[in-house]
């Protein structure tokens, strides 16, 4: 399934940049009164990679399963009233700022990141089982793994359709 599908369908452009690896709202410090970022935190898993991976990880609030990413989900939220752009507007702004015409095969990247997060959480579940987990709430990650993997497969199917 998905573990075989991802490498077989990785026809993404080879584009190497510095990537954060965990670029998401919980690792960004915003200015208290202005709409701008003051700092990006938590760089310990930064590496060289495809920046669209960071982008689609950052946007998981828009497309991830409602209760499984461990972060807020925008499903059913009036984003406009909160000043939060839609997924499409966010991607369009990214493309505008980076000089892109669009994102090729965005569903592949979304499937990859959902699968990646499911694998990370499964690793935490293993640490709970082995008694080596640091976080007292780590066991709750077990319930998140399957919905993430299922959502990843849905994105893989969308990637297949083009």
Regions found by a protein language model. Give the residues of each.
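Active-site activation/catalytic loop segments of kinase-like enzymes and analogous catalytic loops
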Residues: 53-98, 112-130
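All-alpha amphipathic helical-bundle segments outside canonical DNA-binding/catalytic cores
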Residues: 101-113
């Amino acid at each position: 399934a998905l573990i075989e599908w991802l490498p077989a369908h990785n026809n993404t452009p080879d584009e190497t940049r510095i990537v954060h690896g965990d670029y998401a709202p919980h690792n960004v410090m915003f200015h208290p009164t202005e709409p701008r970022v003051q700092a990006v935190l938590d760089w310990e898993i930064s590496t060289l990679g495809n920046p669209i991976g960071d982008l689609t990880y950052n946007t998981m609030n828009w497309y991830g399963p409602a209760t499984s990413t461990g972060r807020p989900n925008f499903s059913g939220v009036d984003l406009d009233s909160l000043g939060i752009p839609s997924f499409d507007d966010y991607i369009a702004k990214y493309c505008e700022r980076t000089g892109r015409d669009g994102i090729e095969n965005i569903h592949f990247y979304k499937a990859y990141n959902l699968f990646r997060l499911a694998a990370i959480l499964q690793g935490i579940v293993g640490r709970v089982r082995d008694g080596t987990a640091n976080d007292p709430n780590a066991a709750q990650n077990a319930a998140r793994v399957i919905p993430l993997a299922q959502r990843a497969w849905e994105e893989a199917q969308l990637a297949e359709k083009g």
